[in-house]
């Protein structure tokens, strides 16, 4: 009994086969439903673009190759510079000079007087000699601006004539190349005549400029157009001298040439004639890296002399000399000079000298007419530099000489000047310094006296003690 018959076994096999077929059909149905569900849920795939054939660029420059060799990476293009705001383009600085002068001794012939310092004389004491504000900056890559007013200017003719604002410098430098070797300077600026004239008053050791060179250009400045050529290595020379505190004259080119009105800074032009000036300077190093310059300069033009009534030789009524602008000489008189310069910077001993010759307007011996006469003069100075634990000491001695017409003064008085100066500048810091100078002088008082029977232009001989406190900011 315990065995299955043949017919029953066949029926069981057919039933099992039917179940398997049904399961397989259901599985296929589920897979199809899953496929359709995935297609609805997943986005269509983006077709892959065809691969471009490789280009052989090995023969091109490295910066053009797509895959340069190792160690020769393709340079990265720099991002464009961010434009600066207007107040980020400019710097503001300045300095103030407070003076006190005392006449120690006088021979009594002429009153004490210095062209460059109105506080030398009777009834004088403290004076704000300069109050300068300097604004400068780059307007663009090739144009820079320089503006310097003085708030200690004086206006003649009134007891409250001091401490007025007056423009000293207002010019633009237009650079013709990226290295700034070639540039035009347009506006009111210093005339490139005389190394000491070009040197800033904040850097000069003597309190005033020498008369021979300074009498060439009133206020050292004028309105005009100047061209300067300054090779890169010369720019570096001037920059080093300035940064090292050697009291340089600034960057006025290895070569400069220009035209200007001729009457002097802050004065109106009086004739239809331009002055022409040219200057060359050769900076060099000598003896263990010391720095020096040699130079030559000259100018030519017609100068209109302004006048004031005087009593000729102190006899008779006061009259205006002939040959002056107010005496109908509107074209002016011949004005020409040539000068030489040598400067050895104080490292630690220095020497500085300039000499000029020429022809220019000068009052004649009878004091009745202004005529063209010869002139000559100059100066020589030795100085030293001693660094202290705090600050510096700079002693100096200078001889100053001039014989000729002082054209920028009324009536261009014939002046005879010879003086010796012994001084010491003590720099407590970069922002504070004190200069003390003893002066032994014999010079012409260039003040025109309009009273009848009163002689103008007497000689002043005497001794001066002069002090100046300078604050730089």
Predicted regions located by residue number:
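Outer membrane beta-barrel
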Residues: 79-112, 118-265, 270-277, 281-288, ...
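Alpha-helix initiation/capping motif
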Residues: 11, 51, 56-58, 208-210, ...
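A generic structural signal for ordered secondary structure
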Residues: 17-20, 28, 38-42, 132-137, ...
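N-terminal periplasmic/intermembrane-space "pro-region" immediately following the signal or transit peptide
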Residues: 6-116, 161, 175, 468, ...
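Bacterial N-terminal signal peptides
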Residues: 1-2
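Outer-membrane beta-barrel pore domains
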Residues: 104-107, 119-120, 158-159, 170-177, ...
């Amino acid at each position: 009994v315990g065995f299955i018959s043949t017919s029953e076994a066949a029926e069981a096999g057919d039933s099992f086969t039917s179940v398997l077929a049904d399961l397989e059909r259901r599985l296929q149905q589920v897979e199809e439903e899953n496929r359709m569900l995935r297609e609805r849920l997943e986005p269509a795939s983006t077709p892959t673009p065809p691969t471009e054939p490789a280009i052989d660029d090995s023969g091109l420059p490295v910066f053009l190759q797509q895959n340069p060799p190792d160690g020769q990476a393709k340079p990265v293009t720099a991002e464009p510079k961010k434009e600066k705001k207007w107040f980020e383009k400019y710097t503001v600085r300045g300095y103030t000079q407070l003076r006190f002068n005392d006449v120690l001794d006088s021979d009594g012939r002429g009153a004490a007087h210095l062209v460059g310092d109105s506080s030398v004389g009777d009834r004088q004491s403290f004076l704000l000699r300069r109050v300068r504000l300097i604004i400068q900056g780059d307007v663009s890559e090739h144009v820079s601006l320089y503006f310097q007013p003085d708030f200690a200017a004086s206006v003649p003719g009134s007891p409250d004539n001091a401490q007025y604002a007056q423009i000293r410098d207002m010019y633009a430098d237009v650079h013709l190349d990226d290295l700034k070797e070639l540039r035009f300077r347009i506006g009111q600026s210093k005339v490139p005549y005389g190394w000491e004239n070009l040197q800033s008053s904040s850097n000069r050791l003597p309190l005033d400029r020498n008369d021979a060179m300074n009498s060439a250009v009133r206020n050292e400045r004028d309105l005009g157009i100047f061209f300067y050529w300054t090779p890169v290595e010369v720019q570096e020379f001037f920059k080093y001298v300035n940064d090292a505190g050697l009291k340089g004259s600034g960057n006025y080119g290895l070569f400069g040439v220009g035209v200007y009105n001729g009457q002097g800074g802050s004065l109106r032009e009086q004739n239809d004639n331009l002055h022409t000036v040219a200057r060359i300077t050769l900076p060099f190093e000598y003896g263990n890296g010391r720095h020096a310059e040699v130079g030559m300069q000259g100018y030519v033009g017609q100068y209109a002399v302004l006048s004031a009534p005087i009593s000729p030789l102190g006899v008779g009524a006061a009259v205006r000399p002939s040959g002056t602008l107010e005496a109908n000489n509107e074209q002016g008189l011949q004005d020409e000079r040539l000068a030489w310069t040598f400067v050895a910077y104080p490292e630690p001993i220095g020497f500085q000298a300039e000499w000029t010759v020429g022809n220019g307007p000068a009052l004649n011996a009878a004091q009745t007419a202004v005529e063209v006469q010869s002139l000559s003069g100059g100066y020589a100075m030795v100085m030293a530099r001693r660094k202290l634990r705090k600050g510096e000491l700079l002693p100096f001695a200078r001889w100053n000489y001039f014989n000729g017409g002082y054209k920028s003064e009324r009536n261009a008085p014939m002046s005879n000047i010879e003086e010796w100066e012994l001084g010491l500048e003590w720099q407590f810091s970069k922002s504070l310094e004190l200069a003390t100078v003893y002066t032994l002088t014999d010079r012409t008082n260039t003040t025109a006296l309009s009273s009848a029977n009163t002689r103008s232009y007497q000689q002043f001989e005497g001794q001066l003690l002069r002090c100046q406190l300078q604050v730089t900011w």
